[in-house]
Design a protein with these regions (language model features):
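N-terminal leader segment of winged-helix/HTH proteins
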Residues: 1-17
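C-terminal regulatory/oligomerization modules of transcriptional regulators
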Residues: 1-6, 25-39, 44, 53-61, ...
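Conserved strand-loop elements at the edges of beta-sheets that form or border functional pockets
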Residues: 16, 62-64
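Pre-recognition alpha-helix immediately N-terminal to the DNA-recognition helix
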Residues: 20-22
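Short, Lys/Arg-rich nucleic-acid/phosphate-binding segment
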Residues: 64-70
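Short E/K-rich amphipathic alpha-helical oligomerization segments
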Residues: 71-75
């Protein structure tokens, strides 16, 4: 069954390049919106819109500090994506292992005839 694409979906949220850039920006640590705007060279309303989506799926958390709103990455909420991607990583590794085995066999036999 196909997944529905909603903004409450981690997969949909990280499907947007600007949102991935925001996540990349937050890897270094907590930042106010203005710093993210400077990092990405997007408008403040655009960044705020993307931060809202990322917050809705739990990838980003915010807290108030004085007049600033600081945002931080919630890495644990990337786990569903990591788990999904791990299946494909395992499949690719198994295929690469078979290629390695075949190449070793060819080398042992003296190469292709």
């Amino acid at each position: 069954m196909a997944r529905s694409a909603t903004t409450a979906d981690v997969f949909n949220a990280i499907g947007d390049a600007n949102r991935r850039d925001i996540l990349d920006s937050l890897i270094a640590g907590e930042k106010p919106v203005g710093a993210i705007v400077s990092d990405l060279r997007l408008s403040q309303p655009q960044v705020s819109k993307h931060l809202r989506v990322l917050s809705e799926v739990g990838l980003v958390r915010s807290r108030a500090e004085g007049r600033l709103r600081l945002y931080r990455l919630e890495v644990a909420h990337l786990q569903p994506f990591h788990d999904w991607l791990a299946k494909y990583e395992q499949a690719m590794n198994a295929r690469l292992d078979r290629v390695d085995d075949y190449l070793r066999k060819l080398q042992h036999e003296g190469g292709p005839q």
